């Protein structure tokens, strides 16, 4: 077998970078007499990118299609934020098979694909055990090693001479039950190549575990991975993607087609507010929506910009200041724990803390609706409306061992809840 595989991972909404990558992919395809495949290992989407955020990642799959992608696996940037139903939306617009074998049930995806004599399997990080049961989306995570072993066997029987795992598990992920290095070790002799993502590693010369080669192209479309297969030999390298690389016209043209669709959607007037649409307003909205006694909203989580002034609310400005992908939820919380949450959420250290889910923003103040914190009765329970950020341990306000078991309004996210409130 003589084959060139080009690969990317963790592009995270870098449209300009993807357009430059597409130019290199097209150039290599033109210059290379052998067959060339372009594969992506997930997380092309990004909530802080305008086109990606507004379309819940679908625009990025249209652009990846324009870049000439042959197959991609599902990452975690979109479905963890918007719910797994968006994966089917991505699959509908993608002009390549979207692969995901280890999470079930998910619509629109394939466990594997046979591209000529190359078998490709897709797996992604399940985050099993990281989130509470209430945020599992009803998805079951299958054990990756026996699953990939069986899929590889099936692909071999169907004629695959090379078996590639497009993996969003992470090259090294000590805190996770499985990563790419452990996958390669366990499946030596059954798979040939793992293209890694999720951990954003750049492996200039790749890695080898037994007979399995691992490759990863870093992040943000700054590099294009290149794998040369010549018989039994597999060579790995990465190609820098200079800023001066001209963008591919097909990617730019697709972005220009998407923009008017987005602008028309964003121009709609949703309703009016008679006071600033700020953290207090959102805490009130969450309390009312979830039929709760108390509403909580972390300002830096629900708003990424200045509050909207009183008056008409247009979708575009609303979405500009509310890029949160958190889901409204409700939980019963003891007065003692609620008091602790408010104390933490209003402490100077917590207010100034920057957490990764907020993409570098500070928490700012915890807003409280429907209750004077000084009047909390430690001996009773309160029904609290908030979002998963306030009600799950990764937000920093609650402890994992509290076992709150919130109920969430999936797949609605904060800005959609605001829209529904304004339209009533």
Please name every model-derived segment.
Residues 122-125, 298, 386:
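Flexible glycine-/small-residue-rich
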